[in-house]
Swiss-Prot record:
Gene: rpsU
Compositional bias annotation for Basic residues: 43-57
Gene3D superfamilies in the record: Ribosomal protein S8
Residue numbers spanned by region Disordered: 35-57
Source organism of this protein record: Bacillus licheniformis (strain ATCC 14580 / DSM 13 / JCM 2505 / CCUG 7422 / NBRC 12200 / NCIMB 9375 / NCTC 10341 / NRRL NRS-1264 / Gibson 46)
Protein name (database record): Small ribosomal subunit protein bS21
Length: 57
């Protein structure tokens, strides 16, 4: 869980920008989207193999 404390004399927009940056760095949002629905292990393996094939060519 990302946590951001608003500093003294810091605008809310700046704090929100720091929070968004920390969330994107940790990959929290991507992980939540990935785990939103159950994915069978066979489908997961298929996606992983397709991604590897895409990287190779």
């Amino acid at each position: 869980m990302s946590k951001t404390v608003v500093r003294k004399n810091e605008s809310l927009e700046d704090a929100l920008r720091r929070f968004k940056r920390s969330v994107s760095k940790t990959g929290t949002l991507q992980e939540a989207r990935k785990r939103e629905f159950y994915e069978k292990p066979s489908v997961r393996r298929k996606k992983k193999s397709e991604a590897a094939r895409k990287r190779k060519y």
